[in-house]
């Protein structure tokens, strides 16, 4: 069975049609964890879980995993053997051959689940991972949980609010995404906090999560703070720009990470400006980068480029490159380099208005 959609796996679970091997991985770790736990619970059943639900990790021996796989279920139709974060790169060729043989010999009464709640891998570049996925597709199903689109994230947040007995208006959801980012684990945590506050204050029936609550209670992610910094730079807002840089250093963010995120914001603006000047909508810039589930970056860039020329954007990218080289090769303190960069970017934006 080839790579399947999450929805297809849910249908299999609902129908009780579980057998063979499943590999559950992907960028969206919240969904990897939730889907895998549901799969493991369904495959193991509720009978004698201490025998029929056996969990292993990357540190477990292949012999132990193999023995568990070969053992018959205890007073049940099937059992589940799960392995979390099995790192193919850390295994020898002999070990991997043993793994694939283990898959081949696994009895029909055992459901094997290899799931990746924390480990990321590149299945296209690494020959080991490429073979791992190919072998898995030949013997079972591979489910990759990708990043959600902004619309899907808004629906997720609305459902979580409803489960808790609250209402999340779309503007509040939009603001939450802008501030907390698009990682579902982080969003779920912030949503739980907002719902608890809304229920405690009892504003409305059911309680509504307002934009003011989001503004006051949700800490801004590094990416969001850098977006706001880019906005301030383009607007020529000296005080706000340096204030946001202070916030980033106060949060102990790595200077190279700050510069990287700021550079990404300027690249977004450059791409959007190029699309608009070519007579295309700003959304066309998405074809030049990975913007799936991150289209808000292009919307943010589109607002900024109204007041800045392509020439200034090119100059700004050159300044960012100089700062990057200075951070990596200069003896100057990182704060001094970034302070100087902010001044130069503000000056470039100001000259565009003269």
Where do the language-model regions lie?
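Conserved beta/loop motifs at nucleotide-recognition and modification sites
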Residues: 1-354
């Amino acid at each position: 069975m080839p790579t399947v959609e999450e929805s297809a796996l849910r249908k299999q679970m609902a129908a009780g049609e579980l057998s063979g091997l499943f590999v559950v991985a992907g960028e969206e770790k919240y969904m990897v964890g939730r889907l895998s736990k549901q799969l493991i619970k369904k495959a193991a059943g509720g009978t004698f879980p201490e025998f029929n639900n056996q969990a292993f990790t990357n540190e477990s021996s292949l012999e132990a995993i193999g023995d568990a796989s070969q053992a018959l279920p205890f007073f049940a139709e099937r059992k589940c053997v799960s392995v979390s974060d099995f790192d193919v790169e850390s295994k020898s060729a002999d070990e991997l051959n043993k793994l694939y043989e283990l898959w081949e010999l696994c009895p029909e009464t055992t459901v094997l689940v290899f799931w990746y709640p924390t480990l990321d891998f590149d299945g296209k570049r690494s020959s080991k991972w490429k073979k791992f996925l190919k072998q898995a597709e030949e013997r079972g199903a591979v489910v990759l949980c990708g990043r959600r689109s902004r619309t899907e994230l808004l629906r997720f947040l609305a459902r979580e609010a409803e489960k808790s007995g609250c209402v999340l208006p779309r503007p509040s959801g939009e603001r939450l995404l802008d501030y907390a980012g698009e990682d579902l684990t982080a969003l779920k945590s912030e949503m739980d906090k907002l719902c608890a506050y809304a229920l405690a204050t009892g504003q409305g029936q059911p309680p509504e999560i307002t934009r003011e609550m989001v503004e006051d209670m949700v800490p801004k992610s590094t990416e969001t703070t850098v977006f706001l910094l880019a906005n301030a730079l383009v607007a020529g807002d000296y005080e706000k720009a340096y204030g946001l840089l202070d916030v980033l250093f106060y949060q102990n963010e790595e200077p190279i990470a700050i510069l990287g995120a700021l550079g990404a914001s300027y690249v977004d603006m450059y791409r959007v400006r190029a699309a608009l000047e070519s007579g295309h909508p700003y959304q066309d810039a998405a074809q030049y980068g990975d913007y799936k589930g991150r289209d808000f970056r292009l919307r943010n860039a589109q607002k900024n480029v109204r007041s800045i020329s392509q020439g200034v954007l090119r100059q700004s990218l050159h300044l960012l490159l100089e700062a990057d080289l200075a951070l990596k090769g200069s003896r100057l303190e990182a704060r001094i380099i970034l302070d100087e960069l902010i001044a130069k970017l503000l000056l470039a934006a100001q000259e565009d208005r003269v």
